[in-house]
Amino acid sequence: MNENKGNFANKKMIKRAVKDSFIKLSPKTQMENPVMFLVYISSILTTVLYAVSLVGIRDSKSSFILGITIILWITVLFANFAEAIAEGRGKAQADSLRAAKKDVEAHKIISLEKKDEITKVSSALLKKGDIVIVVAGEQVPADGEVIDGAASVDESAITGESAPVIRESGGDRSAVTGGTTVISDRLIIQVTSEAGESFLDKMISMVEGAARKKTPNEIALQILLISLTIIFLLVTVSLYSYSIFSANQAGVVNPISVTSLVALLVCLAPTTIGALLSSIGIAGMSRLNQANVLAMSGRAIEAAGDVDILMLDKTGTITLGNREACEFIPVNRVDENELADAAQLSSLADETPEGRSIVVLAKEKFGIRGRNIRESNMEFIPFTAKTRMSGVNYNNSEIRKGAAETVKDYVISRGGYYSKECDEIVARISNKGGTPLVVAKDNKVLGVVYLKDIIKQGVQEKFADLRKMGIKTIMITGDNPLTAAAIAAEAGVDDFLAEATPEGKLEMIRDFQVKGHLVAMTGDGTNDAPALAQADVAVAMNTGTQAAKEAGNMVDLDSSPTKLIDIVRIGKQLLMTRGSLTTFSIANDLAKYFAIIPALFIGLYPGLSALNIMNLHSAESAIFSAIIYNALIIVALIPLALKGVKYREVSAGKLLSRNLLVYGLGGIIVPFIAIKVIDVLITAIGIV
């Protein structure tokens, strides 16, 4: 999925785009873009005018008509090329995905109870609800849910990520994708999609653009462009009638030529944005694909650009996902070294990230090295949900660590004393957003291990940037309100939802939407599905359940919760690019007006030469220069349309001011300079 990332295009893509540019000359394809269809019709009209001029029926020189005709056809081809090069990126990605989509032999069974009764069938014949067995070395034949077993799966063909992932029955890691490969153990999978409707099929369809529909914003902009084009068409027709009247009044034989008026119409029509509009939308989808995010619709990308509420999971997005030991706090005058030694002993067999961090902290702070856990006199007590403690029996002593209330009951049951000091330390750590683990030896409390949520580096700056953009961030966590408040304050989020439930998340999203906000969120579990279905931008993790993926309108193939921030940036960049190029395109008309209008009427009204502020060489050179610029600017802006306008984390007001300056004022100045340069060049080489 990361193919061509960061590249404008390669030779193969350019070659295919050139070929497609000519294929797109069919009337059916041209009619899909009304603005460029006008240029297409104009090209046909001038071609006919040139043909009849060869037999003596003309209102301009044949060479002039031929020149305008060639430039108009080149303009149409450039517009086709812009769209084809954008589509080419998607086709290149689709080709790599098709390579992963192979018809393989599937081992179908009737039920879990009859695992030995295997029927070999083609993966293309599998239906929703079928059960298959996939062993190490085999490709997963279809999308499904793991209903038995656990295995490492290579998903690089889909995600581009070489590291294998674990897929297992139950929980939020049960979804598997057809085209991935099992590299260890065995999975029993229930198929969840019909043939041709798999996740891979949807990906191919989306990246190729076959399933892409115009978004409401695109439709609204296209209506504006069509309206402007109709206005300019009426103006041009009126000018022709006016030129006939003026010619008769002045006693001049020839009014303005039809060819010149066609050139005027094409120059005044918003052809630049008309040619690039489709490319901008396709490129936005492509940038998401390059970020390993699959958008189910262009509407979702646009919504991401308008989002003003971001609901972010604490774990994995704001924090690293694992709490780490950061301090040993002894009580009852216990030596800190003794507490660290006991805490490390109780954690030697603890393979959780928290347990390993205790071992590391004791080593770093006191130089206490881990002992051999295979010593015969060590009996490790594993953590269970029932006991809420873990520990070790060692040298006739019982060392335990766990939740405060559990350890308190343990100590008191053995005739020990649980001090008020320990309660105060536990409360203080909880208020800071940390997790206290109390450590006891036999019937004596030694102290507390402070486990802290580690805030990801740089998230405070990211949230500050989002705030500048007018986006409110809300942290979603299952922690208690005190812990949630402390972490939210440290991370710099605007608000939080503590002890979050599926119902609570859904209610919060609805409340914001009623107030007119657009909400984005991420999720991976079945319990996230209702909220994902309600959110305007819903990013489901690829590692998540099938229900979550179906509820979301985007799927993150990397399963990175922080990707939501990048998605919002891409959405805003898409909207900015479209707006900036629209502004530039319309601003261009002013310069082209000063180039062509004096050239058209200077024969009838010599006084209009005062409007020739660019001092263009002649009427013909003015028209040629304007229409050549009109074609070249399309090609010049293709890289910007594909890469997008550079996005900055500033307020909408500042962005608008900057873009009006760059693309509004720039859209006026650039054509004045370019048209003058073209006029000098074509005059120097004798074209006119």
From Swiss-Prot:
Enzyme superclass (EC): translocase
InterPro entries: ATPase_P-typ_cyto_dom_N, ATPase_P-typ_P_site, ATPase_P-typ_TM_dom_sf, ATPase_P-typ_transduc_dom_A_sf, HAD-like_sf, HAD_sf, P-type_ATPase_bsu_IA, P_typ_ATPase
Signal peptide location: none
Membrane topology type: Multi-pass membrane protein
Binding-site list for Mg(2+): 524, 528
Subcellular localization: Cell membrane
Enzyme nomenclature, EC number: 7.2.2.6
Keywords per UniProt: ATP-binding, Cell membrane, Ion transport, Magnesium, Membrane, Metal-binding, Nucleotide-binding, Phosphoprotein, Potassium, Potassium transport, Translocase, Transmembrane, Transmembrane helix, Transport
Gene Ontology CC annotations of this record: plasma membrane
Cell membrane keyword on record: yes
Catalytic activity: K(+)(out) + ATP + H2O = K(+)(in) + ADP + phosphate + H(+)
CDD domains found in the cross-reference section: P-type_ATPase_K
Pfam family, one: Hydrolase
Record-listed ATP binding positions: 350, 354, 383-390, 401
Role according to the record: Part of the high-affinity ATP-driven potassium transport (or Kdp) system, which catalyzes the hydrolysis of ATP coupled with the electrogenic transport of potassium into the cytoplasm. This subunit is responsible for energy coupling to the transport system and for the release of the potassium ions to the cytoplasm.
Family: Belongs to the cation transport ATPase (P-type) (TC 3.A.3) family. Type IA subfamily.
The protein's name: Potassium-transporting ATPase ATP-binding subunit
Origin organism lineage: Bacteria, Bacillati, Bacillota, Clostridia, Eubacteriales
